[in-house]
């Protein structure tokens, strides 16, 4: 099964795994899970790091590259199809990072791993990963 890991789940898996529920931990550790991390997550992390609102032990480029290898995450680039799909989503909230993740999950037929309850307002397959 293909899973798209949202930014908060990605960060929790790296440094605060206790925040993830057991089902999420099992999916992330399973050798049969196809795990993807979007370029939008990298953008969000780099942006928040630059603003000073997300402390990291090293630069985002190093941190993310290391995490992709450790967790065997596949990179998911942003396409024009994703961008257009994000623009077509109902406006349940205005976070552009979240909207892009939802659009990508829909376009690529992936299940979104998230800890953000607002995602439930959209018609996207998801698994809630928080406790």
Q: Predicted segment positions?
A:
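Active-site neighborhoods of divalent-metal-dependent phosphate/nucleic-acid chemistry enzymes
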Residues: 55-61, 65, 69-115, 129
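Generic structural signal for small/hydrophobic residues in well-ordered secondary structure
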Residues: 7-8, 45, 86, 105
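Short, well-structured N-terminal submotif of metal-dependent ribonuclease cores
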Residues: 1-38, 51-66, 108, 117, ...
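Alpha-helix capping/helix-boundary segments
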Residues: 9, 41-42, 82, 101, ...
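Phosphate- and divalent-cation-binding pockets in alpha/beta enzyme and binding domains
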Residues: 44, 85-88, 121-122
């Amino acid at each position: 099964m293909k899973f798209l890991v949202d930014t908060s789940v990605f960060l929790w898996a790296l440094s605060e795994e206790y925040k993830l529920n057991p089902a999420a931990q099992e999916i992330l550790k399973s050798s049969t899970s196809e795990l993807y991390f979007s370029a939008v997550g990298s953008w969000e992390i780099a942006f928040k790091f630059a603003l000073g609102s997300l402390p990291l032990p090293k630069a985002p480029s190093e941190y993310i590259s290391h995490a992709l290898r450790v967790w065997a995450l596949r990179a998911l680039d942003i396409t024009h199809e994703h961008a257009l799909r994000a623009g077509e989503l109902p406006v349940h909230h205005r976070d552009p990072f979240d909207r892009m993740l939802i659009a990508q999950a829909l376009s690529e037929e992936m299940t979104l791993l998230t800890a953000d309850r607002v995602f439930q307002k959209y018609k996207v397959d998801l698994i809630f990963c928080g406790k």
